[in-house]
Amino acid sequence: MSPRRFRASVDFAVAPAVAFDYLGDPRNRPEWQSSLLSVTLPERAAEPHLGLAWRETTMVGVRPRMEITRFERPTAWAEVGRWRGVEATLVLAFEERRSGCRVIAEGEISGRGAYAVPAAVAGRLAGLAIGADLRKAARILGSR
């Protein structure tokens, strides 16, 4: 099956650098990403950087290995996640706005073999899920 693409955009009432620093740090993920239980970094104090890798544990038991593949503060950030026959990418773009910034999330999910159908289903839901997660992150940052 071909990759399933998704997209979402959310306005944040903070500067692009603030949104970038929060969203681009895997240690913050369990606070705003609804499907995530925990993040395991090889070194908990490691600052986010290009090539940083970690493992996530999701509510459904999936434990993908994640890696930051783009780190251009404060304008662009990307990651790739792999778990068994599934691969997912996420790219975040940070656009300055008069009242803060807009975060644009684009990505795709693909699966091989027995994982093709579950990946396609996950891809259909990903745009809605990332939109909801980004709105939660915007609320968290807006209240600080």
Please annotate each region the language model reported.
Residues R4, V14, A53, E79, ...:
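Residue-level detector of alpha-helix boundaries and kinks
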